[in-house]
């Protein structure tokens, strides 16, 4: 049995045992609640709502409250010097579909919902990193103080004397061309 539910203005096709990401819902982590906005129920017999199916409900459990990956928002208008750069993370709720019930029939999930607390997992990882850093520092032992040798100062090299460069004299043909150019220009 499957159902098409509506939440957050969007429609989702779900079956018992599915995990669905929907827009953020104000529900506690691990909370079990019913969604009554069922647009259609399918399976052995199909029921289409106008707009909702009466007596149909989907029981779900909140398994995760988190944010999506970072999305880059980049706007540009060419040749105008207009560039905007921003990022965005959308909050979402992950739901585990426990059961679908309609017209006295109920389709239940064989599996149990696994609730994940993202903040607790992140805190555990941070503590593990700190503990590993402290352990490495303890294994390394006390730092030894080593005196640096004084730097040797190199003597400056004496600069070479400048050599006069000889300038070639202009040939007669070059002088004629310059003169010709000057006379050809008119003011």
Curated annotation (Swiss-Prot):
What domain of life does the UniProt record list for this protein's source? Bacteria
Q: Where is this region: Disordered?
A: 157-187
Q: Which GO terms describe its cellular component?
A: cytoplasm; ribonucleoprotein complex; ribosome
Entry keyword annotation includes Magnesium: no
GO terms of biological process kind: translation
Q: Quaternary structure per UniProt?
A: Part of the 50S ribosomal subunit. Contacts protein L20.
What is the recorded name of this protein?
A: Large ribosomal subunit protein bL21
State the organism of origin.
Answer: Bdellovibrio bacteriovorus (strain ATCC 15356 / DSM 50701 / NCIMB 9529 / HD100)
Gene giving rise to this polypeptide: rplU
